From Swiss-Prot:
One GO cellular component term: cytoplasm
Region (Domain II): 70-148
GO MF term (any one): four-way junction DNA binding
Superkingdom, taxonomy of origin: Bacteria
Main location: cytoplasm
Keywords: Cytoplasm, DNA damage, DNA recombination, DNA repair, DNA-binding
Similarity comment text for this entry: Belongs to the RuvA family.
The protein's name in its UniProt record: Holliday junction branch migration complex subunit RuvA
Gene name for this UniProt entry: ruvA
Keyword Metal-binding in record: no
Cited function: The RuvA-RuvB-RuvC complex processes Holliday junction (HJ) DNA during genetic recombination and DNA repair, while the RuvA-RuvB complex plays an important role in the rescue of blocked DNA replication forks via replication fork reversal (RFR). RuvA specifically binds to HJ cruciform DNA, conferring on it an open structure. The RuvB hexamer acts as an ATP-dependent pump, pulling dsDNA into and through the RuvAB complex. HJ branch migration allows RuvC to scan DNA until it finds its consensus sequence, where it cleaves and resolves the cruciform DNA.
Length: 210
């Protein structure tokens, strides 16, 4: 029904269970959109006009409008909620935990450990998501122009150690994923190099960009 809405953000709402809502005023009408906390941070209340992609969910007892930063993010959300046992809130939780290309990569590679970091996503659900979406997303990400994992990224063993260390230092999964991707694109370190060397570069990037 609605592909996107264009208007001004006039307010935020935070609810229990990691639920976040954004109030978007369009031609004098305020729309309440359920969004990720990341999108909430991206669009603070201010007079500039923004465009948010939407999905309208109609149930017997309610109508809910979901908001997304891009058409690709909305498309992945719709694919996720078609998986048995994955509802809209869990899909938003997955989108909030990892940047879109990283989330797609985790699904395609069957990395259930990374998927299980999203609040509410257990190991069995993560396995089901990977099993049902792996093939479709492998082709879809190429259509969307997402790059696959770079050979410059750390090996899985090194990455796991880095993620655990950076999580302990207080960084979020989304920040860690962005840092490792950025470092992997510029570093001369081998992918199986000493984790401490990767850690130094990752922290340097995070200090400059967060």
């Amino acid at each position: 029904m609605f592909v996107y809405l264009r208007g001004t953000v006039v307010g935020h709402q935070s609810e229990g269970g990691h639920r976040c809502a954004l109030i978007l005023e369009v031609n004098g009408v305020g729309y309440r959109l359920l969004v990720t906390s990341h999108l909430l941070q991206q669009y603070p209340p201010r007079p500039e006009v923004v465009q948010i992609f939407t999905h309208l969910s109609i149930r017997e007892d309610q109508m809910l409008l979901y908001g997304f930063a891009s058409a690709a993010e909305r498309d992945l959300f719709l694919r996720l909620i078609r998986v048995n046992g994955v509802g809209p809130q869990m899909a938003l939780s997955l989108l909030d935990t990892l940047p879109l290309p990283e989330l797609v990569q985790a699904i395609v590679s069957g990395n259930t450990r990374r998927l299980s970091r999203a609040p509410g996503v257990g190991h069995k659900t993560a396995e089901r998501i990977a099993l049902e979406l792996k093939a479709a997303l492998s082709a879809w990400r190429q259509e969307m122009g997402f790059t696959t994992a770079s050979s410059g990224l750390p090996s899985e063993a090194v990455r796991e150690e880095l993620e655990l260390t950076l999580l302990a230092l207080g960084y979020s999964d989304r920040e860690i994923a962005a840092a490792l991707t950025a470092v992997g694109q510029t570093t001369t370190l081998p992918n199986n190099s000493d984790p401490e060397a990767w850690l130094r570069e990752a922290i340097a990037w995070l200090s400059a960009n967060t």
